[in-house]
Amino acid sequence: MFPFQPMYPMQPMPYRNPFAAPRRPWFPRTDPFLAMQVQELTRSMANLTFKQRRGAPPEGPPAKKSKREAPQKQRGGQRKKKKNEGKKKAKTGPPNLKTQNGNKKKTNKKPGKRQRMVMKLESDKTFPIMLEGKINGYACVVGGKLFRPMHVEGKIDNDVLAALKTKKASKYDLEYADVPQNMRADTFKYTHEKPQGYYSWHHGAVQYENGRFTVPRGVGARGDSGRPILDNQGRVVAIVLGGVNEGSRTALSVVMWNEKGVTVKYTPENCEQWSLVTTMCLLANVTFPCAQPPICYDRKPAETLAMLSANVDNPGYDELLKAAVTCPGRKRRSTEELFKEYKLTRPYMARCVRCAVGSCHSPIAIEAVKSDGHDGYVRLQTSSQYGLDPSGNLKSRTMRYNMYGTIEEIPLHQVSLHTSRPCHIVDGHGYFLLARCPAGDSITMEFKKDSVTHSCSVPYEVKFNPVGRELYTHPPEHGAEQACQVYAHDAQNRGAYVEMHLPGSEVDSSLVSLSSGLVSVTPPAGTSALVECECSGTTISKTINKTKQFSQCTKKEQCRAYRLQNDKWVYNSDKLPKAAGATLKGKLHVPFLLADGKCTVPLAPEPMITFGFRSVSLKLHPKYPTYLTTRELADEPHYTHELISEPSVRNFSVTAKGWEFVWGNHPPKRFWAQETAPGNPHGLPHEVIVHYYHRYPMSTITGLSICAAIVAVSIAASTWLLCRSRASCLTPYRLTPNAKMPLCLAVLCCARSARAETTWESLDHLWNNNQQMFWTQLLIPLAALIVVTRLLKCMCCVVPFLVVAGAAGAGAYEHATTMPNQAGISYNTIVNRAGYAPLPISITPTKIKLIPTVNLEYVTCHYKTGMDSPTIKCCGSQECTPTYRPDEQCKVFAGVYPFMWGGAYCFCDTENTQISKAYVMKSEDCLADHAAAYKAHTASVQALLNITVGEHSTVTTVYVNGETPVNFNGVKLTAGPLSTAWTPFDRKIVQYAGEIYNYDFPEYGAGQPGAFGDIQLRTVSSSDLYANTNLVLQRPKAGAIHVPYTQAPSGFEQWKKDKAPSLKFTAPFGCEIYTNPIRAENCAVGSIPLAFDIPDALFTRVSETPTLSAAECTLNECVYSSDFGGIATVKYSASKSGKCAVHVPSGTATLKEASVELAEQGSVTIHFSTANIHPEFRLQICTSFVTCKGDCHPPKDHIVTHPQYHAQTFTAAVSKTAWTWLTSLLGGSAVIIIIGLVLATLVAMYVLTNQKHN
């Protein structure tokens, strides 16, 4: 009664009753089916009440607007007059119900914060381009220049800017010109900084991710070309040129700027320009704007269907369809927009193979079933329709069906759908139904009306399709979010169509009756009927629209009555006959399409990891069958891919180059082995042997075997020589009777009676008798010197030539060096320049991208078999027409006997013929679920470097091509080219579901049935479809109208089942593979040459830096093959305090610090990494050098989670202790002393023996 709610005073606290309240009486629970009926009735009454309110609005005044809502401007005096009249009747008119119930729908939504900001900034810096009085696009002023899209025709709505002479840049689809000086102060600023996130434009938020700008679908359209995209500071980051719909979002074609201020254009595939160009349609040789047709369906249905059929291939068909179903002057609710198209159609009856008892003509025949999403939903296409009442008006949760020519309706909750168990019906739209069903091998739909149960079943394997790497059967409550494909629960236009056409004639025997012994035909009210009779040798064929008797015919079997209808479409089903003559066809949008979404996937229990020496043991406990994939981060990945269903243990080897495993849906984990082993390389022989046996088992066994062999040979040779010498010494005395052997000879058993020649006499003898031996003896000392030199060189750590050359070349003003191509590992060096202090340079690659040049060959996806309604000719023959559609097959079958729900279709039994046609087209879900075949070519390399030169740091992106320089703080840096042209991508690659596969796909036009590429499209939206599916038509069954066929299974589906793991899990060198664009990141392969051009301003004079007068280096702790496991302490005395660069010229050690702070006297601690057991390196501090050396021990941890930050040039060699024991075994100082004693004894024996004989 009142337009406002009264305010009542607060009620006092209720009186507390000391007596207990009686128990609440029990009532039986309501029947849930009854509750659903009540809810459906309530919803219907609400809809009816709402329509009545819209049809007869109250005469009272409009609702009183709140203070926050801005009053709308009144247009026209007539509107003001009505407003005044309403004020006069305010007292007597009924209250406005919308005010009481709240404003549920705002006609003018207030712009958001982003839109308001952009509108404010655009007011003086963006100018519309007018064409024939309409806004065709926009021009904006950025950085003192005018930019307008080249494809936008028209004149800028500003006299000054319109008079400017522009230059064209066709590469970027832009025209530009310098604006006058007085306008430059009020222009946009541009920026190349585009971190991932959200930006703003005229229609709200724009998402920037992976180098692409996207907006929600439906935001932005023709006429928005030239609008700027702004960041939070009001700077222009891009200019919009067009867009393309990609599922639930629209990708924008933009022009932006890179780091160098150079214009860059990004255009997604199949992008269309967003200039407001009017699309023209055709009607009876007269063109008209597709959005403004001269007729509409509600007024002229038959003519409207003919108009749509004539423009079915026109690019503006969607605009024409939208305008044709909404007549001018009629406005409907937004919810009706989803259902209005299907009022052009009607349900039909079709043959179902499996009804309740055998086959039948069912009102709910199932045409197709699809379940390709990852959410467990099923999309059905049936002969019945949903969301419409029998008259074609909107009625939610309702199914209408054709029951022998009469369209009836039933609430949707009375329709059941089940597989192995009942399904949950989500929604329906047109011929399509969306439901969630449990697993099963068939799907059945049924309903009961007037004690009659109608059902239809089709064989189809319904199963849950998990996404990710764990084969779960039900969506989990918790887990990780992963990209997936789900069926959209709405009927928005997503670019897929289903083909319609005018229905053929339907036999209806109920229209034929006998009246007074004569055949009488009564067509339904408002429709026509075709009557064909064979009576007394007379053939009758006549179209009637009212009851008519045929005096020549006395039996009902002599006549056939066919229903005719030319103002409704039906689905182009193979279960319906085709209309005679040229069929008017059309197309409507398919609802509930696959769309990109996010699914919750389970996470398998984390594996229990046990580390060993160069090994990892994984103890796995999967909840579902889970994939385990591993690879080595080396040149040969040696990947493994295994599905694990039971608890198990897997052991893997890990190298110093790295190893990666991916368990289920968990992120990848990487491990690196360290050079650890038991024993002590600096201990006793058995400790040394144990240490090296664990590190190098084969080399240790080989070395010990050689040593044992040498010792054995030496002992055997010594024994043999001793025996031989003894026998030679004793023989002369044995041959002499009563000979007495001297005591010393008896002890040593060896003596020589001859006098030794001098060295000169020996050389004289060789010169006179054997000069070759003379020269050989002279060359022996030289050979020994060469051998000793080579042994010393092999046993000592010598700096390689390239390192020496690099250190020598570092003194140049233009500095050149080479760093490893490994992300995250710092490379430090210094520049020595005469008269200046060493300048430290530190370079850390943060990200390295390898982007190949790709060429899209074709796109492949699931195919759909299209079948035309068969053309049936009674009592006659016919021929196939030429075929033009992909893989189209046409065949004529004679002797058919078609039968419909209304009776036999033809009079003849065997003279009838049927033309069956079938062809191949892409699936409705091809836009969301498809694979793209690319050919990859030469790759470009980009490196994101964190560079520090002296005290100046910057982060910049460098093109590693050896040509493109980068300038920062006066330093000019040129990188590349990469030392190797390696790429993880083969010549042929396939992109599917955000992953890349190396796959040798067939060329375009050479696809084979059942294999990848059986259908091929140049782009997802193109019409040049190639198909080869081995489609063969079969003879139709007698008594039925259908088009049977056989066909090879989908090659795309088979490839998805058989495909190997993607490059994300199998690429060598630890590459990380991404898409949009296709690229490989952080591949640890090769090296990057760097050339610096350093200005004088960055150098410091030597006189301004400290000078060390004394320095001593001590290794406090040293662990080799570990991440900065060495600690060196340098005690020094400096001339003054200051900052000095530190560097190791050789590759023996890698320093963590690039510079240190020095006092006049003290010590400094430096951390380093080394792979040497006995590191000995020269440490440069400022201009002074100090030598650091010591012993290193193996690391304690077998496996670590990060790579080693030291040079791999010098691996851990054999320790000095081991060399000492080895040389002691084979020789050394003790052996030399023994040999000396033996020689002294021999000399003494010789002297004594010679004296005895004399």
UniProtKB/Swiss-Prot annotation:
- Region listing for Transient transmembrane before p62-6K protein processing, in residue ranges: 735-754
Q: Where is the lipid attached (S-palmitoyl cysteine)?
A: 729, 749-750
Question: Which parts of the sequence form the motif Supraphysiological nuclear export signal?
Answer: 41-48
List the residue ranges of the region (Disordered).
48-118
Classify the source by domain of life: Viruses
- What is one process in the GO biological process aspect for this record? symbiont-mediated suppression of host toll-like receptor signaling pathway
The annotated region (Interaction with spike glycoprotein E2) lies at 167-172, 259-263
- Quote a single Gene Ontology cellular component term: virion membrane
Q: Which residues carry this modification: Phosphoserine?
A: 123
Gene3D superfamilies membership: 1.10.287.2230, 2.60.40.350, Alphavirus E2 glycoprotein, A domain, Alphavirus E2 glycoprotein, domain B, Alphavirus E2 glycoprotein, domain C, Tick-borne Encephalitis virus Glycoprotein, domain 1, Trypsin-like serine proteases
- The EC designation for this entry is 3.4.21.90
Renumbered to this chain, region (Ribosome-binding) spans 111-125
Catalytic reaction(s) noted: Autocatalytic release of the core protein from the N-terminus of the togavirus structural polyprotein by hydrolysis of a -Trp-|-Ser- bond
Q: Site described as Cleavage, positions?
A: 274-275, 333-334, 756-757, 812-813
Which Pfam families does this entry report, sorted A to Z? Alpha_E1_glycop, Alpha_E2_glycop, Alpha_E3_glycop, Peptidase_S3
Q: What PTM annotation applies here?
A: Structural polyprotein: Specific enzymatic cleavages in vivo yield mature proteins. Capsid protein is auto-cleaved during polyprotein translation, unmasking a signal peptide at the N-terminus of the precursor of E3/E2. The remaining polyprotein is then targeted to the host endoplasmic reticulum, where host signal peptidase cleaves it into pE2, 6K and E1 proteins. pE2 is further processed to mature E3 and E2 by host furin in trans-Golgi vesicle.
Remaining remarks = Belongs to the New World alphaviruses that can cause fatal encephalitis.
- The name under which this protein is listed is Structural polyprotein
